Curated annotation (Swiss-Prot):
Residues given in the record as ATP 2 binding sites: G607, P608, T609, G610, V611, G612, K613, T614
UniProt GO MF annotations: ATP binding; ATP hydrolysis activity
Protein name (record): Chaperone protein ClpB
Binding, ATP 1: G208, E209, P210, G211, V212, G213, K214, T215
Statement: the UniProt record of this protein carries the keyword Chaperone: yes
Function: Part of a stress-induced multi-chaperone system, it is involved in the recovery of the cell from heat-induced damage, in cooperation with DnaK, DnaJ and GrpE. Acts before DnaK, in the processing of protein aggregates. Protein binding stimulates the ATPase activity; ATP hydrolysis unfolds the denatured protein aggregates, which probably helps expose new hydrophobic binding sites on the surface of ClpB-bound aggregates, contributing to the solubilization and refolding of denatured protein aggregates by DnaK.
Region (C-terminal): 770-867
Annotated InterPro entries: AAA+_ATPase, ATPase_AAA_core, Chaperonin_ClpB, Clp_ATPase_C, Clp_N_dom_sf, Clp_R_dom, ClpA/B, ClpA/B_CS1
Coiled-coil regions, chain positions: 393-526
Subcellular location: Cytoplasm
Length: 867
């Protein structure tokens, strides 16, 4: 008996049997050790005994009992599992003799099962015979699984029933009702049927973007085969979906994958055209299993495809078809393309309506029709990097799951009562320990409140339980109706007219009537739990997925938006025109009035340095997102050279940094609802403006990897110092800009930027130099910020009007704007104050007054001692 003639599975089984012997400290490997492993899930021998009629759980128990009866050996020099027992050696010799009789080249595990049944003296054989398992039954099971094949390779066990092992019968799935209905793809299904009916090149390949429904078309074909709604040449055909993952998984040795695929193809060939094979992600077969000197899977398929022995349906995406299939012209030639386009919003709504019942039954919720319409429309508008109907189905599924989770959690009212109960019980326990009159009186009040809260809790709990039971009953009734409809379909397909009539005129109308009555009796408006999916829930899911505020405005948000201009004015002083223009753009967008194909707003801020251009962008970000760093800031001084322009959208293929993506496109792809600030735009290379043209006009930009990035939910702000000298000189005492200056600045802008760029910007806003009154307000804001930093030390700052005016006058330089103020306050307020704190003259919990004396600032400590 040569171990080289053992199959891989048998060699592995012997190794595992040795491990079992070592774990149990048995000196020899016996029959129970080997069969303990061979009857594990996934093993061939387990399948053989199962088909022969053995109770596998009881068989495992019997093997454990036999293993427990073997004596445990202990000692220093004992080699556990080092040799075979005489019974196992006899079994192996008998199995080898049977191998020769069967004409097998290798000894396989199924031959071992056949040989075991001939060992009448073995304990395991006796047990199987007692259970009614005979040698004939085991042989029949082996013959069924082998399908007339001999063992000619070391991996033969992997090749038995290859289609069942590596594929899924889609027609069987459809017959059992395990597939979702396919709606609105009749044209593509008919194309597939036409191609399958051809004499040559009868292999369709479905090509389309991910999520458009390629696999659904194949499932639709399977459902048509079940209904008999196909030409005669396709009736009674079987449609198998090949799982390339499980076919490749575990193929350790060269040639093992090819052997498995050959076994699948052999079964298909034997079926004499009755099996149609479907390979999803068919591009994987190009190059699969290819190593140096070997063929890939695609080359194994070519001869059968050419001779018409294999009917194959493939599915792949446009990019992968181009990348893999088109390179192999011989393989591509054998397929006929069927292009699967993304369905329209209207078609998607029809698909969602068709699947509505399936979602309702699965989640146990009610889905409103307007929620389906919202899912199709909102996903089409806001989720731009995916395709319909997949993204719309995701929204409905996610919203339904959210409602289901809420239904299984305590309602808010009940939760509040439970918390109140806990608080009162803690208070009652504490008061019981007190004896004074006030505590006794309070205890009586607490006990009354406790009794009332317990009654309320009981009422709410009963109401909630009743609602849950009602929902479950409704869900069960829907499931029963769905099953009855599926049974009717099967009865009609099988021409069981009596059963069909019984279902159509008896069971189904009765269930529909009961369901209608249940829905009419439930008054959902006063329920504790929300059990229906509405457009609001869909909008919330979109907001969570994209970060774009799609949901209806709640009262607090309305108030916030109506006062957006006021909040911006508080932070940005002296620039009313700019603040109003930006806040109006935001209001238009949130009211849904802006052009859906352009950014929310695009502005160019012109003005001298330090007048609030960048500050306004930060203030807007803070008001919209509650954080002023929630914006994409691009410093255009970094894009002065032609070579650096590509960094915005990402390097072209073949260049360093191609995989990283662009600094602008990646930032907006991750945060589609954001403010994009192009700081110092005039410093950028002219090529940058060419990139921005399509962003400003169509709200989209294609990055270096060919992906389209959506800018329709961004506010674009460009700042520039162009015409600063003119703006500084052309302002009157009240801070108003003269018409001549305005015209001169616009001429300067037009000479610097191309007309097609300027024409696409919503508004060009000129920031005027700050007046003294505005500077005084800024001083107060800067002192307030300093005061906020001192709050940790519990130190309060106060500033007198004289000090404020003096700082404004001394620290402001019109040419430099408000920025020198910060430096002035750092030198004249922060530094002296820091010295006072370090010296211990300003203690915590004290108030420091900043006053003006003899043309310099003085700090007066108004100490407040702790109470």
């Amino acid at each position: 008996m040569n171990p080289e003639q053992f199959t891989e599975s048998l060699q592995q089984a012997l190794q595992q049997a040795q491990q079992i012997a070592q774990t149990r400290r048995h000196q020899e490997i016996g029959v129970p050790h080997l069969f303990k492993f061979l009857t594990q899930p996934g093993e061939l021998v387990r399948q053989i005994f199962s088909e022969a009629g053995a109770d596998l759980d009881q068989l495992q128990t019997e093997l454990d009992r036999e293993l427990d009866d073997i004596a445990v050996v202990s000692g220093g020099n004992v080699q556990y599992g080092g040799s075979m027992s005489s019974s196992l050696a006899t079994l192996m010799q008998a199995a080898d003799a049977k191998r020769k009789a069967l004409g097998d080249d290798y000894l396989a595990t199924d031959t071992l099962a056949l040989a075991l049944m001939d060992q009448t003296g073995d304990q395991l054989t006796k047990y199987l015979n007692q259970q009614g398992i005979t040698a004939g039954q085991v042989k029949n099971a082996v013959d069924r699984i082998r399908g007339g094949q001999r063992v000619t390779s070391r991996n033969q066990e992997d090749q038995y029933q290859a289609l069942e092992k590596y594929g899924v019968d889609l027609v069987k799935q459809a017959r059992q009702g395990n597939q979702d209905p396919v709606i609105g793809r009749d044209e593509e299904i008919l194309d597939v049927i036409r191609i399958l009916s051809r004499k040559t090149k009868n292999n369709p390949v479905l090509i389309g973007e991910p999520g458009v429904g390629k696999t659904a078309i194949v499932e639709g074909l399977a459902q048509r085969i079940v209904r008999g709604d196909v030409p005669e040449n396709l009736k009674d055909k079987t449609l198998f979906s090949l799982d390339m993952g499980s076919l490749i998984a575990g193929a350790k040795y060269r040639g093992e994958f090819e052997e498995r695929l050959k076994a699948v193809l052999k079964e298909i060939k034997k079926s004499d055209g009755q099996i149609i094979m479907f390979i999803d992600e068919i591009h994987n077969i190009v190059g699969a299993g290819k190593t140096e000197g070997s063929m890939d899977a695609g080359n194994l398929l070519k001869p059968m495809l050419a001779r018409g022995e294999l009917h194959l349906i493939g599915a792949t995406t446009l990019d992968e078809y181009r990348q893999y299939m088109e390179k192999d012209k011989a393989l591509e030639r054998r397929f006929q393309k069927v292009l699967v386009a993304e369905p329209s919003v209207e078609d998607t709504i029809s698909i969602l309506r068709g699947l509505k019942e399936r979602f309702e039954i699965h989640h146990g919720v009610r889905i409103h029709d307007n929620a389906l319409v919202a899912a199709a429309k909102l996903s089409d508008r806001y989720i731009t990097d995916r395709y319909l109907p997949d993204k719309a189905l995701d929204l409905v599924d996610e919203a339904s799951a959210e409602i289901r989770v809420e239904m299984n959690s305590n309602p808010t009212e009940l939760d509040q009562v439970n918390r109140q109960l806990m608080r009162l019980e803690v208070e009652e326990a504490a008061l019981k320990k007190e004896t004074d009159d006030a505590s006794v009186k309070r205890l009586a009040d607490v006990q009354k409140e406790l009794a009332s809260a317990k009654e309320k809790q009981r009422t709410l709990s009963e109401r909630w339980d009743s609602e849950k039971k009602s929902l479950q009953a409704l869900s069960d009734k829907k499931s029963a109706l769905d099953k009855a409809k599926h049974d009717l379909e099967n009865a009609e397909n099988n021409y069981d007219l009596e059963q069909a009539a019984k279902l159509q005129h008896g069971t189904i109308p009765k269930l529909e009537q009961e369901l209608k009555a249940m829905e009419a009796n439930d008054h959902h408006e006063d329920w504790l739990v929300e059990e229906s999916v509405t457009p609001d829930q869909i909008a919330n899911v979109v907001s969570r997925m994209t970060g774009i505020p799609v949901a209806k405005l709640v009262a607090g948000e309305r108030e916030k938006l109506l006062h957006l201009a006021d909040h911006l004015h508080e932070r940005v002083v002296g620039q009313d025109a700019a603040v109003d223009a930006v806040s109006d753009a935001v209001l238009r967008s949130r009211a849904g009035l802006q052009d859906p194909n352009r950014p929310l707003g695009s502005f160019m801020f012109l003005g001298p340095t330090g007048v609030g251009k960048t500050e306004l962008a930060k203030a807007l970000a803070e008001n919209l997102f509650d954080a002023d760093d929630h914006m994409v800031r691009i410093d255009m001084s970094e894009y002065m050279e032609k070579e650096s322009v590509s960094r915005l959208v990402g390097a072209a293929p073949g260049y360093v940094g191609y995989e990283e993506g662009g600094q602008l496109t990646e930032a907006v792809r991750r945060n589609p609802y954001s403010i994009v600030l192009f700081d110092e735009i005039e410093k950028a290379h002219p090529d940058v403006f060419n990139i921005l043209l399509q962003v400003l006009d169509d709200g989209r930009l294609t990055d270096g990897q060919g992906r389209t990035v959506d800018f329709k939910n961004t506010i674009l702000i460009m700042t520039s110092n162009l015409g600063s000298e003119l703006l500084l000189a052309g302002v009157d005492d009240q801070g108003h800009l003269s018409a001549d200056t305005h015209q001169q600045v616009m001429q300067l802008v037009q000479s610097r930027f191309k007309p097609e760029f300027l024409n696409r910007i919503d508004d060009i806003i000129m920031f005027t130099p700050l007046q003294l009154g505005a500077i005084e307000e800024i001083v107060v804001k800067l002192i307030d910020r300093l005061s906020a930093r001192l709050q940790d030390r519990e130190i309060t700052l106060k500033i007198s009007d004289e000090a404020k005016k003096w700082i404004a006058k001394q620290g402001y330089e019109p040419a430099y704007g408000a920025r020198p103020l910060r430096r002035f306050i750092t030198n004249h307020v922060e530094t002296p104050l820091a010295k006072e704190i370090i010296a211990g003259r300003v203690a915590p919990k004290s108030t420091v007054a900043i006053n003006l004396m003899d043309d310099h600032l003085v700090f007066e400590n108004q100490s407040t001692q702790p109470a």
